[in-house]
């Protein structure tokens, strides 16, 4: 029996259940084990709780043998690799884009100046401000139902959340607008899951690897390499999205490339620096580092450490 650790929220258990069911479909007995995390217990802003707020407890459960593996929202994992664990599988990704849920079926551009829009993501808040729509950003915590209720009860005019979460809970009918990357770049690895186990557990890793999706792994690797490079001393809002795309060479042959777009925004929305690049799936990390380097050349470091943003440390 493979014991799969998961956070206790409805979204987390729904995500983990897709992994459990896929393992069972492949002939492997599996069950879910709920683990409480600091991020679930605290109502404080996420950025004040430190790195690994949703993942540390799950990793501890793997290490002390309460579970064999854990399912994470990939974007919650610290970018620094922990040698005690291995990401054995990254299943096919859900839609990585952000979504708007607004009153009266409105889209962002239809909301009046001064409308209250909820998000606790600095990345979303910065890019919303950069759109220049005169929206008032308000903090947003709690599970997805709690967030949606703040629109339906009139507390907020709109919220911006990950489309993938709404999809997994069957709430896509609530979406009034899906934001294209040109409007708002998603968080690196948004919409992707990471299935983690002990680094030395090669037998289990082989079983879990049956669920791995090569294109998703390449995209997430590029996005998180960009993030890791940019996080060297900054807490700025960073967005990134990579995708495997088909291209045609001069002789008409079709081949696949990995496309990556990234951005860094000032927290107050006064500036957004964007860069992009093309590479191969086999060199996804190098692509992420190259686009990060271009962002630095365009002034990302000054933007990140400028007024309104502050470095995380030395």
Curated annotation (Swiss-Prot):
Gene Ontology cellular component list: cytoplasm
PANTHER family per the UniProt record, alphabetical: PORPHOBILINOGEN DEAMINASE
The protein's name in its UniProt record: Porphobilinogen deaminase
Pathway: Porphyrin-containing compound metabolism; protoporphyrin-IX biosynthesis; coproporphyrinogen-III from 5-aminolevulinate: step 2/4
Entry's EC annotation: 2.5.1.61
Needed co-factor(s): dipyrromethane
GO biological process, any: protoporphyrinogen IX biosynthetic process
Gene: hemC
Subunit structure of this chain's protein: Monomer.
Lineage: Bacteria, Bacillati, Actinomycetota, Actinomycetes, Mycobacteriales
Note: The porphobilinogen subunits are added to the dipyrromethane group.
Modified residues (S-(dipyrrolylmethanemethyl)cysteine): 234
One Pfam family from the record: Porphobil_deam
HAMAP family attached to this UniProt entry: Porphobil_deam
Role according to the record: Tetrapolymerization of the monopyrrole PBG into the hydroxymethylbilane pre-uroporphyrinogen in several discrete steps.
């Amino acid at each position: 029996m493979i014991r799969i650790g998961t956070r206790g929220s409805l979204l987390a258990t729904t995500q983990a259940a897709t992994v459990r069911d896929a393992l069972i479909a492949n002939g492997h007995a599996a069950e879910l084990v709920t683990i409480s995390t600091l991020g679930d217990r605290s109502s404080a802003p996420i950025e004040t709780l430190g790195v690994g707020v949703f993942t540390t407890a799950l990793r501890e459960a793997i290490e002390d043998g309460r579970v064999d593996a854990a399912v994470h929202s990939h974007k919650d994992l610290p970018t620094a690799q922990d040698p005690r664990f291995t990401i054995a599988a990254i299943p096919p990704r859900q839609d990585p884009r952000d979504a708007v849920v607004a009153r009266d079926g409105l889209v962002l551009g239809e909301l009046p100046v001064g409308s209250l829009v909820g998000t606790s993501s600095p990345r979303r808040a910065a890019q919303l401000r950069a759109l220049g729509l005169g929206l008032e950003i308000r903090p947003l915590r709690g599970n997805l139902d709690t967030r949606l209720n703040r629109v339906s009860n009139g507390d907020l005019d709109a919220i911006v959340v990950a489309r993938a979460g709404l999809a997994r809970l069957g709430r896509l009918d609530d979406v009034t607008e899906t934001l294209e990357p040109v409007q708002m770049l998603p968080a690196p690895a948004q919409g992707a899951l990471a299935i983690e186990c002990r680094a030395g557990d090669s037998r289990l890793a082989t079983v879990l690897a049956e669920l791995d999706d090569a294109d998703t792994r390449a995209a997430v690797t590029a996005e998180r390499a960009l993030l890791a490079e940019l996080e060297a001393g900054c807490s700025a809002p960073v967005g990134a999205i990579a995708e495997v795309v088909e291209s045609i060479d001069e002789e008409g042959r079709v081949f696949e490339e990995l496309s990556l777009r990234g951005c860094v925004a000032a927290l107050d929305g006064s500036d957004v620096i964007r860069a992009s690049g093309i590479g191969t799936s086999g060199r996804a990390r190098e692509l992420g580092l190259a686009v990060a380097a271009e962002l630095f050349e365009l002034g990302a470091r000054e933007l990140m450490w400028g007024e309104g943003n502050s470095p995380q440390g030395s």
